[in-house]
Each structure stands twice: as structure tokens, then as C-alpha cells.
Amino acid sequence: MEFEQEYTAEEALNIEKEFTRLKGKHYMDHAGTTLYAESQIRAVHDMLAQNLFCNPHSSPLTGKLLQQVRHRLLRFFNTSPSDYSLVFTSGATASLKLVAESFRFRPPDEPESSPDEGAFVYLRDNHTSVLGMRSVVGTERIDPLEPEELLRHLKVSARCSGGTKPSLLVFPAQNNFNAAKYPLDLVEEIQQNGLSGYDDERFYVCLDAASYVSTNFLDLGRYRPDFVCMSFYKIFGYPTGLGALLIRNGSEDVLDKKYYGGGTIKIMLSGQNLHLKHDDLVTRFEDGTQPFLSIISLLEGMNTIQRLIPAANGYRPMERISKHVFSLAKYCYRKLGTLQHANGKKAILFYSDTRYETRDRQGGIVTFNVLKDDGSHLGFSEFAKFAGQHQIYVRTGCFCNAGSCQKHLGLTDEDILMFYEMGKVCGDDTDMIEGRPTGTVRVSFGYMNKKEDVNRLVDMINDCFVSKAVSNVAMVSPIRNVIKNEGIALKAIYLYPIRSCGGYRITAAWPLTERGLKYDREFTIVDSNGNPLMRNKHAEMSTIHPKIDPSLNFLILTHPFMEDLILKIRKLPTEFNDGESIDLGDAAAAWISKALRMPKLRLLRTSATDRKPPHKLLMINWDAMKTLSDDEGVESDATMSWLVDHFRGSLIVEGKAEEDLQGWKEVKIGKKRFKVQANCSRCPMIHVDQSGEAIPADSLKAIANVFTKKIPLGVHLTAVDEGFPEGVLECGSILEPVRQSDSPKAHIIKDSVSTRYNFLVK
């Protein structure tokens, strides 16, 4: 499968030298933010270190430099101050908000109370920041438009616009969901001929260019929207918090800015509400002191792009970047499209509006979900965790584009409201509800990406999620109607006295307090600054295996290469308050410092009430893990023991291997009752051997394959009330689950959505 190379070998090498921090990493979230080059930041540092930049309101020299940046940016978009005015803002969102608050939807001679107002029209595929404009625009006529309706205006001859009611159309140059590009010829078409069905309106066009300008050349000499909104970190990586609103000269007549800040007025009276704004458009719109140091830094952003990707063969730097990212996206789309399971079913479901045939219609983004071999979806949160362990950086969810996400996932408004009632909110990690995906995976490319990034992504998906042989283990639904619980019992209890250190197995009984297992995670190792040590940063912590002697109240520290240290667990003083801790002394400090080969460590005991809320107990189904591991060729008992320690499960149960723990709502273990909260989120961590033990690479890969199957191996147990039931948990106790019904709540929600939210759903 061919990849069309845009850069020369020398250019590719120079770009690679600028991003040494990417060694071993594969960053593919450039629609979120692109990356800054190392020389770019050094140049900014040198410029700031060697010059004195004063407040532009105080120093005309700084003001002149800002004007130079402004003119340079206009040239970057092939325009000039004679055609456009560039207003600096905090980003594309602030630019859109400024247009929304300022746009006058009535003719100048019409009072605000007049019903003769124009319309605000937006695409449903717009970013959330555009949808937010609906809340502040000065008109009641707010209409969504389907993309197909907008594109239709290029295919039919519309009337010549003779309307007088100022109206505003907002659409994206490129959809940030999947990089589908809209024909920019629409700008002039709408300006001249309006929209069908709006006979009395005179339309102005606001172009959301935030996604487009990140990897494309926006030619404002050819396409001339009335307003253009963008963020500069999307293009240059640095600085953040800076964007622009470009206003076509002449179109400012329809903007009525209400608020005024420092530097924007010609005269004002402090005792009376009297003021006159500046005649100059830019001065009038830029409230207060602009982030002048950030603005000056844009010079090095432009210099860097023009130096690393110079114009060649008649193409400007940003045009060459556009060609490069499109080639990567096309290569990625085709490579992913070849993935299929052993049973012949496809492994990738794309959410695209094109087939990646031309960069005029498609940008450098590929959006998809992974499908399992039974056709069900892999949740995007699960995918993100696996990707993270492979040093692959992507974006998951809906990317602040509710309209595109809803359309491509086939969700109705009622579905969205039902999901909300069931706990789903924007930005969370709830990726599946009733077997339906709530978001997607987005891969987006920048000028520093390479073909190898795509290959790494495809290899990871192929290794972790594509079945190589048809599984003989039956797939199970996330919600089960029938629970077969014959013979399911508590096999063992694992205690972890010191946070992030190894655990030890209890096969008899152990006390349960309202905060969890007694002594569980009650001790903490801290560094010289008092910061707790965590296992994900200090893997050698797993070589310390503390034990508790409950009869003598001893904490026994063990290490494979050191003598045991026995510490007396003394009764906590009655005045021991929340948030306090007790130092276990110099002997313990010396022992753990030697064991971990770090100086000045201390071992502390924290108050039980300080560990709020009550600790979750991870319950693991041993037989399901064993059966699936055998099916994947993982037969070593040592590997199985390593798994339990790796997941840090507290309760190990055995019984039916096919038991779906996620189908449980509550469970009784002996006489103790618990709430089943959620499935274990540590499964994707199997790629990291935190223990330092010799787990073969083949075993790790086989274990990874286990977790691509739809059989949850662990769930979190929490307290039914404010605290766990106190008493004793005994190994051998039978589990009595309370089943989760066939989602009666969902039916109730579905029936009530139209009545409860009819003021929202139109």
C-alpha cells in the first residue's frame, strides 16, 4: 500500500530533529493541538530574553511590533489590511462569541424592539462553540441547517439576494469531527444569493476556520467571508490562549459591540454613562491590554513553518502540509480498512463523509470505532487505555461536535437525553450504553507525523483487538437477564497494607471495617517532600511485600534481598484527626530507603477516616481469567498470580467462568452486602510489567488478547450505605448476586423523554 511522500529526505530529517521528545511516542491528536518545534521555543526564549517589551499602551515600539505581527498574519492568509482587519482574541471560541454578541439582526434604522429581525442559521455539524452562539445572538429566529441543505446551494441557481434583514450563517471550513471539507465557494454563493426559504434576508457569512487552518492554506484573497474565527495554537503549537477574528472591511457595519474596555474609546465620563468608541475597528474591538508577548511569539511560529516546509513546486508551506496530512490520512484509512477478524468480519467502522479520494473534500483526520469479531463495538475508553500503553496519543469521544457524532452514531435526540438520564455527560469516559457506542476514536495528523506513526497504530489495533482465531468462548452481553450463581464462592482475600506495594494472600478470614479491609492501604511511603510514592512511577515498589500478623499486631516488611523488618502496629491515639499521619520511625525509613534505593523515604500510617470515600474493593473472577488465559495459551500459574497482583484485586472469587459480573447490581458475600459499581478499569494496564518480574513477552501479548473479549474479569464493589458492613469476610463464603434487570429504567426514560424535554426537542 503506497504512501505519497511530500517532503524531501532532507526536509523529513530536519523536521525529525525538531521533535526529539517524540522518540518512542506516536502523537496523532493534531486536531486537538499541534506541537511546537524545539527551535521555535528556543527562538521565542531568546527574543524575550534579549529584548525589553513594554505594555503597548506605554510603548509605541511594542505597538509597532504588534502591527508588524498583524500584517504578517494577514499575508499568511494571502490578504492585507486593505481587505481585512485582524482582531486578536483568546481563541476561536472567543471570536465566535464576539460575533454572536455584536451582530445586529435588524436594519440600522429599526429599533431593537422591532419584530423585523434577521435569522441566525448554523450547521448541525458545527463545533459546540458555534452552537453556544444560540444563547446570546440577538434574534429569536434560530435555525439549524443540515450539511446536505447547505451543499445544495452550489447545485441549484438561487435567487439574487435582495433582502434587507441582516442575517448570519455560520459553517466550518472543515469539520473537526472527521475533517470533511466544505466548498469555500459557498461563501460568495451565500453572500450574493442568500439561502432558499429566506427571501427577505441579507446573509453575512461567518467561517469557523479553527480546524481548517491547522493544516490547510486559507486563501482570503480568493474566498472572502465576512468573519473568520481561528486559534493559533492549532497552527503553530505555541502560544496557547490566542486567536483571531478576521473582519472583512465593510462588514463591521453590522457589528454593534456593547462592552468597552481599556484602550477602546476616544472619550468617556466616569460619572455619566457617556463614551465614544474609537473609529479604528481593531482598536474598538480589542478590550484592555492584549497578550503582547504571546502575539510577538507568533513570529517564530510562522518562521518555523516556512523554514521547515518551504514553498516548493508552486505550493505554499501550508498547502504542502495539507498534501502531507491528507496522504497520511488516506494511507491510514486504507490500512485500517484491511483489518478483519479471522471469521471475515471487518474490524474497523469508519465515520467519514468521503472515501479519501481528494484533499479538496477531505483533510487529515480518520474517525472510527473498533469492532469485535461478533460485530459489537469496542468502547472508546477501552481503546484509549490500550493506545496509551503503546505510547499512541489520539482523541476519543465526540470532540465537542455533538451534531456530527449524533449523526454518524445514528443517535436520536431522545437517545441523547436517555443517555443523560442514565448518567452520561459530555467529556466522561462512559463509552457504551446498552451496547451502543457514545463516542468514537479520532486520529488526526500534523506536519511532523510520519508513515511509521500510522503503521504503529495499525499494528497495535491488529495485535490487541483483531482476533486471529474464532474464539470458542461465548460472547456475553454487558447486561444479563439470568444469573447462574451455583457454586460461586470467595476463593481468597488479598491485602495491600502499604499503598502501591505488593499484597499478600489470605485464605481464611479477615476483618472488614466501614472503610474497607482492615489495614488495607493504611500505610504510605513518602519522599523527602512528603509526596506519596506511586507504583506507576516506581515499579520496584512491588518488590516490597508487607504482611500483617493480626494476633500480635505486627507489620512485617519483606523483600527478596533483605532481612524482614517487624514493626509494632500501635493503637491510634484518640485525638488522631482526619488528615494526620504517624511516622513509623527511623528503622522503617532506613529499611524502605534501602529496599527502593531512594534516600530520605519515610513510612507513614494515615487515619482511616482520612481515606474518604470508602475504598473500592476490586473483585476478580479467577475461573474466567483462568479459562480465558488457557484459551490464549497462558498456562503458567506464576503468570496467573502475577495477574492478580498486577490488577491489585482484593476479593478473588471462583465458580462459573462464564459468569458476567457486570450483570450484577448488588452481591452478598456471606452475610455482607455490597453494591456492584463498575467494571475494572485496570485491564488495559497488562502491557506494563510493573513488578519487574520476568513475564515473557509472548505471555504479555496473550494476556492482552484476553481483555479484547467481552467477558469482564473484575468489578468494583462499594458500600451500599455510607460505609461497608463491619464484621468478618470469610473465604469459602457463597456469593448471592442481585441481578440487574433488563434495563427497565431505560424504558421509563424513553417513555418520559418527549414530555420532560419537549421544551428542548423541537
Swiss-Prot record:
Location of the active site: C400
Keywords, ordered alphabetically: Molybdenum cofactor biosynthesis, Pyridoxal phosphate, Transferase
UniProt modified residues of type N6-(pyridoxal phosphate)lysine: K234
Disulfide bond entries: none
Signal peptide feature range: none
Cofactor(s) demanded: pyridoxal 5'-phosphate
Reaction(s) the record says it catalyses: Mo-molybdopterin + L-cysteine + AH2 = thio-Mo-molybdopterin + L-alanine + A + H2O
Domain of life: Eukaryota
EC number(s) stated in the UniProt entry for this protein: 2.8.1.9
GO MF, one annotated term: pyridoxal phosphate binding
Keyword Phosphoprotein: no
Domain MOSC positions: 590-738
Keyword Transferase on entry: yes
A biological process from GO: Mo-molybdopterin cofactor biosynthetic process
Role of this protein: Sulfurates the molybdenum cofactor. Sulfation of molybdenum is essential for xanthine dehydrogenase (XDH) and aldehyde oxidase (ADO) enzymes in which molybdenum cofactor is liganded by 1 oxygen and 1 sulfur atom in active form.
Family membership: Belongs to the class-V pyridoxal-phosphate-dependent aminotransferase family. MOCOS subfamily.
Name this protein carries in UniProt: Molybdenum cofactor sulfurase 2
